Amino acid sequence: SYSSTPGAEAPEKNEKRVKQYAMMQKIQKFGGAMFTPVLLFAFAGIVVGVGTLFTTEAIMGDLAKPDSLFYQCWNVILQGGWTVFNQLPLLFAVALPIGMAKKQNARCCMEALVLYLTFHYFLSTMLSQWGTAFGVDFSAEVGGTSGLAMIANIKTLDMGMIGALAISGIVIWLHNKLYDTELPDWLGSFNGSTFVFMVGFFVMIPVALISALVWPKVQLGMLAFQGFVKGAGALGIWIFILLERLLIPFGLHHILYSPFYYDNAVVPGGLYAYWATRLPEIAASTASLKSLVPEAGFTATGFSGMVPLSILPAQ
């Protein structure tokens, strides 16, 4: 009996390890798929940086006055550069199926786009009619602390990257389950993506209702977290960088920093977009970067490889 016990436990341990490995692979795959839109930041960031430089009067002088042809031409280019930053949730919704769909990835991207917009049309209409019941002032201006945003010209709740990934994840699950469903011949035109859209259309109604009930409370929590992070100063940055370094060996660091960089965890719209919008003010000011954009310290994760974590809070 003594010798049989290890043999009986070994398959269970191996099975547990296989499941853990499979789960880790899925999480890493999710992190990689989530990172896809970020690849566009390299070029878009250069365009925004150069465009901001040439449209900042404090740097270019009279050449960058708003009524000059030089300014107006560069402003056209600058506004085009904002595409990635302004439509980031939409990009996350479309990009996730590229790495997560098990079949017909391109069709799944289309389904995710259409159902993501459908979700926001449902949510927008619910809030416009019953906003007070959900604790949302839908008449407020978009941005600031209103909790509202414009997604593809739809006034809706600002659910940022988290909302986009959640809706896209639901669509991916529906796509993987339903895409190959064989309908009767007389319903043949509803096969494939059309069937996924049909089912997803009705799924989005309760999802929108739940979002209207829950997300305003989540936003209050995020505002409180933003206040805590800003108040923590260097200690908050140290904790963030420490966690990021600990997660790198597991390939999970994208999941930690994405809400900071691309979502509303610290500032509305994410740190990168926030930084880009503040560039003219920063360029025209003689104040220290720390006083102008204290939140930018969270983007200094790359310095942790050169500077010991033990001394970062002292900076």
Give the predicted meaning of each segment.
Residues 1-184, 195-315:
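Pore-lining transmembrane helices
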Residues 191-193:
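Juxtamembrane/start-of-transmembrane alpha-helix segments at the extracytoplasmic/lumenal side
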